[in-house]
């Protein structure tokens, strides 16, 4: 009996010890751009290396058990950033059939506390990533949908996102989404500024089309903290 109790106690201690070993990079402070504008660092000067994976459709395709399994494996593989699409389409649905939005961009009617609603499921993803020491790089809406989001809707959406996630430690904002930056510029600006107004706590960038860089269009924007370049993964004509 004593031996059994000892084994159980040892197992609990081992599990607890392993959980305590999860490295939380934001314990070094918020992310920011270094003084020489060459690197991402934390507030205390600790360098941050973006080891990211593109799990774009994570909010739509995986249920909660799968999210936990996937993000745990990502941590074990050494990833510290997951790049996801918040909205891939209008409307967007998750694995539970819950709707994220419609063309009105009135998100209040799609928040469902206590259910597996779209936004509650996204909250779960963000929190599960945090428990694994992983940042969520939120691409707010995929570039192909920009013609459905005017400046007014972009401002509403940005306010909604910024207020919802401004106190989460593991958020990186991505405007755009595999698109040329000269398309929908006014809407991208409105979205970015609304997020920044509601959430000054997290860094922001623009995700461009393959073989382009955000610097071509947004380098002078006050909301852009750092540029992104996409090498591309197909032919571009």
Predicted regions mapped to residue ranges:
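A periodicity- and composition-biased signal for non-globular, repetitive helical segments
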Residues: 8-9, 89
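Positively charged n-region of N-terminal signal peptides that target proteins for export
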Residues: 1-4
